[in-house]
Amino acid sequence: MSIQAFIDGMNAQMQRERSKTQMTLGQIIEALEGIPADAQVANLRGPHSYRGYYDDLAFKRSEGTRYASDLLADCKAAMGKAFEGYKGGRYVMGEMTPVWIADYGCCGVKLIALRAGGDIDVDYDD
């Protein structure tokens, strides 16, 4: 086994552990599909590779709310897409990818829950 394969395996295991304590891209899509398309949800925008873990996904939180259907479209577009890491590299986002709330290039908070009306629950990384 090469050193790179070993490191990749460790990174994948750490990502699986993170996905147990916060929403994943697949879970957000599932939650949004259960909310009426015209419902207002948190104004999460600009999906990007998360600064803390480049293979995780982050959204910037903007003021106000947006339609659930618009956020759902952004989430579906991120599925399977490769994002450039903050210091380089390309990272493909998938169903089990943990999601964070953070500005580009910054660390942020874990997304725990997304609700109609614009509320989200977040938590800090351990």
Ranges and model annotations:
Residues 21-35:
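DNA replication sliding-clamp ring fold and its partner-interaction surfaces
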